Amino acid sequence: MELGLKNRVALVAAASQGIGYACALDLAREGARVFLCSRDAERASEAARRIHEETGATVAGIGADLTNDAAAEAFVALAKEQAGTIDVLVTNGGGPPAGVFDDVDVRTLREAFELTVVSAIRMAKLVLPTMKQQKYGRIINITSMAVKQPIDGLLLSNTMRAGLTGWSKTLSNEVAQDHITVNNVAPGYTLTEQQHEHAITRARKLGKSKEEMLDVWAAQAPINRLANPEEIAAAVTFLASDRASYITGITLQVDGGWSKGLL
């Protein structure tokens, strides 16, 4: 199926590993020109090199901390300078630390807000003028299944991702007339480096091994396994494509049936 992504210019945040990397790789496979970033410039460059070698696509890896105004501006400016435009933005701020209410202080709350919510809004602010001018754009935010059903022990993630979802839905209505779509992808438990770290943290509190914790999570989904990052990326790529031109303002769950809600 032709997705209409050939020669589109895509920015993917936090893409040196995990879901972000899988998104950058899948977009490159479809022929998009990809600019990816990571806080670690060396890891970003290495990720870009691997994707280019596998796909032959033009891929640039840039060191950028998107919680910093100047770094985010430089990332977007570089993409515009080299590619001339920006068609697709994938925000992927990463999850804030696990914890319950008693673990959270105001400083941690602010840091989580900056990481998960403000970084995505900042990037949208930077790319939207270009998208509006060309009357085309795709913004996809990586959130979490927690926006449908909050997860015990992830108070910060539950709170921040719900806020990001409200912003995204509102923005989708504001920019629809400019042929810009804004959607979210809400992954379930996914086999990433971060998920393994979370498994270790939860396992210690519950007196289990990491492997036992991963098995517990897998059993919570009717599909009875955890997702691979590539399965999340496939949903992102579809929403970034011309095939999804009439889809906006949604949160697409990719959770193996984990969420029990009807809507």
Protein language model regions, located:
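Conserved glycine-rich cofactor-binding loop
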Residues: V9, A14-G18, D40
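Short, small/polar-rich loop/turn modules that mediate ligand/substrate recognition or access, typified
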Residues: V90, A176, T181, I247-G249
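Substrate-binding pocket helix/loop in short-chain dehydrogenase/reductase
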Residues: V100-F101, D105-F113, I139, W217
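Active-site helix of classical SDR
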Residues: A124, M160, S168
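Alpha-helical segment proximal to the catalytic Tyr-Lys
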Residues: P129, N173-E174, S245
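Residue(s) in the substrate-gating loop at a strand-loop-helix junction
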Residues: S144
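Short C-terminal tail/terminal secondary-structure segment
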Residues: Q149, T237, T248-L263
